[in-house]
Design a protein with these regions (language model features):
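Short, low-complexity N-terminal intrinsically disordered segments enriched in polar/charged residues
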Residues: 1-21, 25, 29, 109
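A beta-strand edge to alpha-helix "cap/lid" segment located at domain peripheries
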Residues: 5-7, 34-36, 40-110
């Protein structure tokens, strides 16, 4: 069973190497991602932007992680700029992730 920290590390590996393999190995064939705007994306959709955009994530805080689901928060940057904090929720199935839902909070303007 994949852990939340392993999943987040796989995301960062895909972002850092422009290689979708870490995502493909952790997501189910019927994987769905739902972004902050409610848009649903398939594995192919996610692999497209995850390997072409300059995203990075860090500051992982795992709130819950068991055999069925996980959730937590992480920081996110795009092109070196802070784009806020992301809250994620994932459903697990057959040892992999079948759903990844995010809600991003933009950085505060000071």
């Amino acid at each position: 069973m994949i852990s939340a920290i392993d999943a987040l590390n796989n995301w960062e590996e895909a972002f850092s190497t422009d290689d979708a393999a870490p995502l493909q190995k952790m997501f189910t064939d019927d994987f769905v991602m739902i972004d902050s705007d409610g848009r649903r994306q398939s594995l192919d959709d996610v692999a497209g932007w995850a390997t072409t955009e300059d995203f990075h994530i860090g500051d992982f805080d795992i709130i819950h992680d068991d055999d069925h689901c996980c959730c937590g928060t992480h920081s996110a940057t795009l092109d070196g700029q802070d784009i806020g904090t992301v809250c994620f929720f994932a459903l697990k199935s057959q040892g992999r992730i079948s759903l990844w839902k995010i809600q991003r909070t933009p950085p505060s303007e000071e």
